[in-house]
């Protein structure tokens, strides 16, 4: 009986502690400040969990979507770009491979739930170099402008308060920022360079491996995603556009093991 009372008391004390800390029951405050500061300052060795000699695996997935209403329904066109490579912190460059695919579809009342108009094709796959935010394909006639590699430093981000910075139970450790148009322009669009006629929304999300630093498990960034909804004018009407960019990072252990070797291999493939 005494043990049951003690257990109940521990639960009550836990609830009180959570309430006093500003988090609800089952919630954990994500201690994002150190890594967001590194992202703000362009400390890419920290952001990317780079190897001791400054190399880091990177994967980037981008999608650029266009939606337009026509007489026979909504026409959509989505450009998918997937890039794998290794970034060299000291030289501020990346060597890797990139693939572009394009999907088109027409949706209307007659084909609800049908994929009869859906088409997806691979446009190209090529070796790539990205240097100081500029991407160059091995075959320089190929357009690789959809490769962004843009999260090299998000100035002023650490001054913003995330709209969400708590982890609940088994949820992933993700913070998010609902950006105003002014914040989007100053923090993101100076690198993304989107041209639009109407801004609708922009959300920046950062996922961590754990909500806080511990002696056994140091926090690191797993993924950064920016999703932007906007509209642009075409023949006196506004067309819906969406752009999403996700960047994924490996662990420092992975990078120490083989990132430099892979960087050299990618570089040789690009040059040859």
Please name every model-derived segment:
Residues 21-66, 267-272:
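N-terminal leader/targeting segments and the immediate start of mature chains
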Residues 81-141:
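An acidic-aromatic
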């Amino acid at each position: 009986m005494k043990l049951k009372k003690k257990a109940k008391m521990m639960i009550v004390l836990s609830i009180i502690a959570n309430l006093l800390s500003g988090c609800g029951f089952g919630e954990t405050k994500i201690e994002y400040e150190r890594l967001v500061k590194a992202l703000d300052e362009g400390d890419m060795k920290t952001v990317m969990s780079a190897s001791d000699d400054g190399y880091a695996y990177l994967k980037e997935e981008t999608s650029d979507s266009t939606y337009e209403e026509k007489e026979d329904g909504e026409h959509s066109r989505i450009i998918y770009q997937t890039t794998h490579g290794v970034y060299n912190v000291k030289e501020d460059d990346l060597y890797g491979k990139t693939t572009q695919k394009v999907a088109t579809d027409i949706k209307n009342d007659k084909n609800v739930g049908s994929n009869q108009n859906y088409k997806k094709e691979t446009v190209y796959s090529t070796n790539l170099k990205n240097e100081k935010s500029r991407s160059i394909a091995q075959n320089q006639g190929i357009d690789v402008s959809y490769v962004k590699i843009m999260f090299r430093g998000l100035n002023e981000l650490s001054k913003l308060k995330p709209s969400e910075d708590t982890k609940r139970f088994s949820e992933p450790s993700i913070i998010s920022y609902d950006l105003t148009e002014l914040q989007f322009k100053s923090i993101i669009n100076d690198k993304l360079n989107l041209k639009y006629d109407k801004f609708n929304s922009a959300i920046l999300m950062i996922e961590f491996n754990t909500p806080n630093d511990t002696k056994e498990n140091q926090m690191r960034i797993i993924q950064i995603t920016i999703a932007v909804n906007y509209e642009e004018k075409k023949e006196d009407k506004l067309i819906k556009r969406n752009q999403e960019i996700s960047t994924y990072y490996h662990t420092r252990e992975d990078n120490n093991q083989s990132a430099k070797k892979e960087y050299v291999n990618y570089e040789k493939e690009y040059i040859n």
